Regions:
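Conserved beta-strand scaffold positions in the cores of enzyme catalytic domains, especially
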Residues: 28, 59, 97, 422-424
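C-terminal lobe/tail of nucleotide-utilizing enzymes
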Residues: 1-22, 218-234, 244-262, 268-459
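Conserved catalytic network of the ASCE P-loop NTPase/AAA+ motor domain
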Residues: 22-23, 50-52, 88-91, 150-154, ...
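Switch/connector loops and helix/strand junctions flanking conserved nucleotide-binding motifs
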Residues: 66-71, 105-109, 167-171, 272-273, ...
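Phosphate/Mg2+-binding loops and adjacent switch elements
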Residues: 117-264, 268, 274-277
Length: 459
C-alpha cells in the first residue's frame, strides 16, 4: 500500500495515548509546546477521553485563553474546578476543568498559612497586591502551588495541565530555583534583617548600619514603596520557608514516574524547532517525556497521484482549452463534425484514471473506454468541465506539496530525536468548539497510524 502523510514509519516508536491515560500510575500529564499548535485542544481532548474511559480528571489551564471553557460548554473557568456536563460517565469517570487565577491562588496560600491578623495585613499591603497581580515569575510559581494542591487532593486521579504558549511554558520548572534565589538574595536579606533582629537592636541596625542603603533604595523606589516592601517582607517572613518547601516538592513530583510530559507541535519548521527545544530541556531537567503529539497533519485520499502528474495533467487541459478557444474563433457555430479537443482531452484523462468525471475523485482507477456519452461532450460544458478538472488537479498538486513538506519536516525531527515516541493527529475540517469535536480529536490521538496503514484523513 502507499502511505499518505498522516502515517509514520513502522520502525518509529509509537506514542500509545490510550495506554498512557489508562495507566492508573499516570497521575499528571503536562502538555507543552509553542503557541497556535492546538495544545489547549489537545489537553481538553485528553481530559474528555480519559474521563470517558473511567478516570477522574481535572484539566488545569495556565493559558489565559478561554477556548478550553468554550469547548467544554462551560461559560467561564476560574480558580475552582468546574464539572463538565455531557461527558459519558458510564465507565465511572468524570471531568472537571479550571483556569489558574494567579492572584486568587496567592491569596489562598496567605489565608491558609497565616493567622487572621497577619493574613489581613499581607492582603491589604500595596506591594503584595502588585506582586500577586502580575509580578514576573509569579504566575509560574502559582502554577506550581496549584498543581501541588490538586495532586494532594484525592478527588482526582489524573491531572492534565495545559501550559502557556512558547518557551515560557516550561518557566514553571524554574520557579523553585528562582524563588530560592529571590529569598536568598541580598535585597530580601536587607529588608528582613530588622524584623529578624527585632526591637531597639533592629532599629539601631536599620538606622546605623543600613541608613545609606535605605536612602538609596528610597530614591530608587520611593519612600512609601520601600515601607510597603519592608512591611510585606516582615509579614511574610515565616511563610517564605513554606513557599520554597512546597515548590521543591512539586518540582520533585514533576520528575516522578507518575508524571508524563507531552510535547505538542504542528508539522511546521518553527513549531518542531520549539518542540526540539522542549525535548532537550525536559531531558536536561530529568522530566519524564511521554512523547510528541504532531497535531493538524494533512492527508489525501488520492496520494497515488503525485503533484508532478497532477500539474502535468492540469497544464495539458489548460493548453488544450486554449487551442480549442482559438479553433472555435474560426469555426462556424453550427459545425459539429468533430468533438472539440478539450472534450477528447477530458475523456482521455478519465480513461487513464487521472480524472473521474462521475465520482469526482482523482487517483488510480481501472482503465476502460470512454463513457458512452463521450460523443455528447460537444456541448459548451466540455470547456467548463476541463476548466474545473484543471483547477481540481492544481489544488491536488498544492495539497501533495504541503504533504511532502510536512513529511520532510517531521522526518527531520524524528531523525534528530529517534527515541521520542510520536503520534500524529489528522487535521479536522474545522475548529473544535464542543465535546463532539474533542472526542473526534481524542479518537485521532489514539489512532496512531503507521506506514502500513492506508487511510483517507480528509473529512
Amino acid at each position: 500500500m502507499t502511505a499518505d502523510n498522516t502515517t509514520l514509519d513502522a520502525s518509529a516508536p509509537r506514542l500509545e495515548v490510550d495506554a498512557l491515560i489508562d495507566d492508573p500510575h499516570t497521575r499528571i500529564v503536562v502538555c507543552c509546546g509553542s503557541g497556535g499548535v492546538g495544545k489547549t485542544t489537545t489537553a481538553a481532548a485528553l481530559g474528555v477521553r480519559a474521563a470517558e474511559r473511567g478516570r477522574r480528571v481535572v484539566v488545569l489551564t495556565i493559558d489565559p485563553a478561554r477556548r478550553l471553557a468554550q469547548s467544554m460548554g462551560i461559560s467561564e473557568l476560574d480558580n475552582v474546578p468546574r464539572q463538565v456536563k455531557g461527558v459519558d460517565e458510564s465507565a465511572g469517570g468524570e471531568l472537571h476543568a479550571m483556569m489558574l487565577d494567579m492572584k486568587r491562588t496567592f491569596d489562598e496560600i496567605v489565608e491558609g498559612h497565616a493567622d487572621a491578623d497577619r493574613a489581613r495585613a499581607i492582603l491589604e499591603n500595596p506591594f503584595y497586591q502588585s506582586l500577586s497581580a502580575g509580578f514576573a515569575g509569579t504566575q509560574e510559581y502559582m502554577a506550581m502551588e496549584k498543581l501541588g494542591q490538586l495532586r494532594a487532593n484525592d478527588e482526582w486521579d489524573l491531572i492534565v495541565v495545559d501550559t502557556p504558549p512558547s518557551r515560557s511554558a516550561l518557566d514553571f520548572l524554574d520557579a523553585p530555583k528562582r524563588l530560592g534565589s529571590f529569598l536568598d538574595g541580598k535585597f530580601i536579606r536587607v529588608l528582613m534583617a530588622p524584623a529578624k533582629v527585632g526591637g531597639r537592636a533592629g532599629m539601631k541596625f536599620l538606622n546605623v548600619g543600613m541608613s545609606m542603603m535605605t536612602g538609596t533604595l528610597s530614591k530608587l523606589m520611593g519612600g512609601q514603596l520601600l515601607r510597603d516592601v519592608q512591611t510585606f517582607v516582615a509579614a511574610m517572613d515565616t511563610m517564605f520557608g513554606g513557599f520554597r518547601t512546597r515548590a521543591d516538592a512539586t518540582y520533585r513530583l514533576l520528575q516522578a514516574p507518575g508524571t508524563a510530559f507531552l510535547v505538542v507541535a504542528a508539522p511546521e519548521r518553527d513549531a518542531l524547532r520549539e518542540a526540539a527545544y522542549f525535548v532537550e530541556r525536559l531531558a536536561a531537567e530529568q522530566m519524564p517525556l511521554a512523547g510528541l503529539v504532531l497535531n493538524r497533519v494533512h492527508g489525501s485520499g488520492a496520494s497515488q497521484l503525485s503533484a508532478e502528474r497532477a500539474l502535468a495533467a492540469a497544464e495539458a487541459l489548460t493548453d488544450q482549452r486554449a487551442e480549442d478557444t482559438d479553433a472555435d474563433a474560426g469555426t462556424d457555430a453550427g459545425d459539429d463534425t468533430d468533438p472539440p479537443s478539450t472534450a477528447r482531452a477530458v475523456n482521455n484523462l478519465e480513461t487513464v484514471g487521472i480524472v473521474d468525471l462521475g465520482g469526482g475523485k482523482a487517483g488510480s482507477r481501472t482503465a476502460g473506454g470512454p463513457s458512452p456519452a463521450a460523443a455528447e461532450h460537444v456541448t459548451p460544458t466540455s470547456a467548463s468541465a476541463a476548466q474545473l478538472a484543471a483547477g481540481l488537479l492544481q489544488l491536488h498538486a498544492e495539497r501533495m506539496q504541503v504533504l511532502a513538506r510536512e513529511r520532510r519536516t517531521r522526518d527531520r525531527f524524528t531523525a534528530l530525536h529517534p527515541e521520542v515516541p510520536v503520534t500524529q493527529v489528522a487535521a479536522l475540517p474545522g475548529d473544535v468548539h464542543d465535546l463532539a469535536g474533542l472526542r473526534a480529536i481524542g479518537d485521532r490521538l489514539a489512532l496512531n497510524l503507521t506506514d502500513t496503514d492506508d487511510t483517507d484523513t480528509d473529512d
